[in-house]
């Protein structure tokens, strides 16, 4: 077809050849070639790719090689980056041991952190202390068990020790402490059947009876000095025959009395108290001779209110002191206590009248409520003799 189209043209001659270089003709023709057949320029434009930190070598495309001549019209295309191995950056993972990651939604509090740290330290200290105590208790229990086992083994190995009484054991101990001398060693304890000395029923609580009916050390000592039951102490038996007892007179005070005298005084006091209750009961109680002139302080009101509070509800406490010269000392200080009910006042009067308070005998009587409400606290004429 091509031959038929251009067959009538004459062949080219040397004069018609262009004077220019043939490379320009080919260069212009190569511009029209496909992009895959174009020869890359000598200076390629810089490639804009994201390079990693380790800066790998850039990928350089291989120069274009023309395919070998062949009769077939098919052409083989070779990719430019086929010969160059692909280099990809290696990612190295960094692991970190983060205990608590920061959360912007929940801000931390320094004070709370300090309290939490202090609490954990306290708990750790308490745990160590408890472990230490538990270990000490276990060691102590272990030692006690070992000692009991050793004691049990000694008792089992010597059965004759269980067949002696307490008196014989005491004599043996006295003989051992005396150096083994039987002639002039320590004197043995007196027998239990001393004249006037009854071990079975002793009224004195200070001496008592030993285990198994044996005499105690106090009984042996007293019997050794010649004491007999019912006799007074001393060489001429002029001492006391009954023990001394402590009698409580106040919340912070007391006196020492004889046991028999205490019983008799208690009976007499009960009789006197029953006689002193006269007149119509009121809610106001008058206490006299509880303290002397000049002894009133700021704590006296609270002390009286607290002492009278065990009889009922105390609503008011007033202290009235008379400072006139030559006034009776036992009437100079008058303490008024108001209760909520007359029954409580009666109960307080029965317990406080005749009671000892700081070495003084307290006198308690009922007082008129109308006078107390009007603050008429001074004694009326004729109430106190000589006033």
From Swiss-Prot:
Classification via InterPro entries: G_patch_dom, Nucleotide-bd_a/b_plait_sf, RBD_domain_sf, RBM17, RRM_dom, RRM_dom_euk, SPF45_RRM
GO molecular function: RNA binding
Biased composition (Low complexity): 19-29
Reported phenotype of the disruption mutant: Reduced sensitivity to red, far-red and blue lights associated with precocious flowering (in both short and long days), lower chlorophyll and anthocyanin levels and reduced cotyledon opening; these phenotypes are related to defects in gene expression and pre-mRNA splicing. Defective in abscisic acid (ABA)-induced stomatal closure and hypersensitivity to ABA during seed germination. Plants lacking SWAP1, RRC1 and DRT111/RSN2/SFPS have pleiotropic phenotypes due to altered alternative splicing of many pre-messenger RNA (mRNA).
Region (Disordered), start-end ranges: 1-213
Main location: nucleus
Gene3D superfamilies: 3.30.70.330
Secretion signal, residue range per the UniProt entry: none
Locations listed in the record: Nucleus; Nucleus speckle
Biased composition (Basic and acidic residues): 103-158
Free-text function comment from the UniProt entry: As a member of the SWAP1-SFPS-RRC1 splicing factor complex, modulates photomorphogenesis by regulating the gene expression and pre-messenger RNA (mRNA) alternative splicing of a large number of genes, including those involved in plant responses to light signaling, probably by helping in the 3' splice site determination. Associates with and regulates EARLY FLOWERING 3 (ELF3) mRNA processing, a key component of the circadian clock also involved in photomorphogenesis.
Subunit-structure text: Component of the SWAP1-SFPS-RRC1 splicing factor complex which modulates pre-mRNA splicing to promote photomorphogenesis. Interacts with SWAP1 in a light-independent manner. Associates with the photoreceptor phytochrome B (phyB) in nuclear photobodies upon response to red light. Binds to the splicing factor 1 SF1, involved in 3' splicing site recognition.
Protein's name according to its UniProt entry: DNA-damage-repair/toleration protein 111
The species this protein was found in: Arabidopsis thaliana (Mouse-ear cress)
């Amino acid at each position: 077809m091509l031959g038929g189209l251009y067959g009538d043209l004459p062949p080219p001659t040397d004069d018609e050849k262009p004077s220019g270089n043939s490379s320009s003709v080919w260069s212009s023709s190569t511009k029209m070639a496909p992009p895959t057949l174009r020869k890359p320029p000598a200076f390629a434009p810089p490639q804009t790719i994201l390079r990693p930190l380790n800066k790998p070598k850039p990928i350089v495309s291989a120069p274009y090689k023309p395919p070998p001549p062949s009769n077939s019209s098919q052409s083989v295309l070779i990719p430019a980056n086929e010969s160059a191995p692909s280099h990809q950056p290696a990612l190295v993972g960094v692991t970190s041991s983060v205990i608590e990651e920061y959360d912007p939604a929940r801000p931390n509090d320094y004070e709370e952190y300090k309290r939490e740290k202090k609490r954990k330290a306290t708990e750790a200290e308490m745990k160590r202390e408890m472990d230490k105590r538990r270990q000490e208790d276990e060691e102590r229990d272990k030692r006690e068990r070992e000692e009991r086992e050793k004691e049990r083994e000694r008792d089992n190995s010597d059965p004759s020790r269980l067949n002696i009484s307490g008196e014989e054991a005491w004599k043996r101990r006295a003989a051992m402490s005396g150096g083994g001398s039987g002639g002039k060693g320590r004197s043995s304890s007196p027998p239990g059947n001393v004249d006037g000395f009854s071990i079975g029923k002793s009224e004195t609580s200070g001496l008592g009876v030993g285990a198994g009916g044996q005499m105690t050390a106090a009984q042996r000592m007293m019997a050794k000095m010649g004491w007999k039951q019912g006799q007074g102490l001393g060489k001429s038996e002029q001492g006391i025959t009954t023990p001394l007892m402590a009698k409580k007179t106040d919340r912070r005070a007391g006196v020492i009395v004889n046991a028999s005298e205490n019983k008799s005084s208690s009976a007499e006091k009960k009789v006197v108290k029953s006689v002193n209750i006269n007149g119509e009961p009121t809610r106001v109680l008058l206490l006299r001779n509880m303290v002397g002139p000049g002894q009133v302080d700021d704590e006296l009101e609270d002390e009286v209110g607290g002492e009278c509070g065990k009889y009922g509800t105390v609503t008011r406490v007033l202290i009235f002191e008379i400072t006139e010269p030559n006034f009776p000392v036992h009437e100079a200080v008058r303490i008024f206590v108001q209760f909520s009910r007359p029954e409580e006042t009666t109960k307080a009067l029965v317990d406080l009248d005749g009671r000892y308070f700081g070495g003084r005998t307290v006198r308690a009587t009922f007082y008129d409520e109308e006078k107390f409400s009007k603050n008429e606290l001074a004694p009326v004429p004729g109430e106190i003799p000589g006033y």
